[in-house]
Amino acid sequence: MGAALRRHGWSYLFVLPTFALFVVFTLLPVVQAFALSLQSARIASSEWVGLQNFVTLAEDPVFRQALGNTVLYSLVVVAAQLTLALVVASLIQPLGRKSQTFYRALFYLPLVNSAILVAMVWRWIFNPNPYGLANTVLGAVGFEPLRWIGSSDEALAAVILSAVLTIPGGGVVLYSAAMGSLPRELYEAAEVEGAGAFTKWWYITVPLLKPTTLYLLVVYTILAFQVFERVYVMTNGGGPNNATITIVQLVYSTAFQFGRYGLASAMAVVLFIMAVAVAVVQFRSLRSDVEY
């Protein structure tokens, strides 16, 4: 042990700053959130209440609505973004190297924009007045304008649609790079057997991309659970009758508008447990021993 420490001591020293930042800015806040979730914590006082905050959440219709909205948003958006990223990457893969580089940059470019700015653009598109872009297009083809984010029945659908139509550039780049490393021998063997383009894509490309798909699935799910700025900007923090409220939005308002830090921490703990549980299920379902 002593010899190993002397041999690798410098390595530990280089890792130490990153580990310290992780402890201070990630691990300690998580521990503090778990501790606060068991207290009736406000700005000037704190009282131990055990699991009462979680009981309050179970009985709160607004939290149940936020939970349902978060789950629905995540299911639709994650499935759509994974599919879009895979399809777009598959379409640009047969192109030449320069064309691939151009399209990868083109689809990745929106990621460098501010999420708030992107949400503001979508708010203008789905503006409920007749001058919103979506209603202008509907009017041009003879349809009546919709209320979109101004309606409790349509607001969540508009938010989900805005996320779905935002092609995930990061996924396109990762899928495209992974496709470039797939063994050509498998495709050549399939061509000898008379396999068509779709057959090769479905039975060779998609299965071999399972590690990349698993990574993107976990990342996209966590990001979907954490959706905040899109809802906050497009629907003013929840929309009509809390139609678009999500768990993170409710955590924000509960903590920083009403000062109920204990209850907000309980919501954050529920979201954390959800994310971990879903990630475990995803890893168990999609983990693969594929090597190439």
What role is predicted for each listed range?
Residues 7-292:
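A structural signal for multi-pass alpha-helical bundles of membrane permease subunits
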Residues 1-6:
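Short, Lys/Arg-rich, polar N-terminal cytosolic tail immediately upstream
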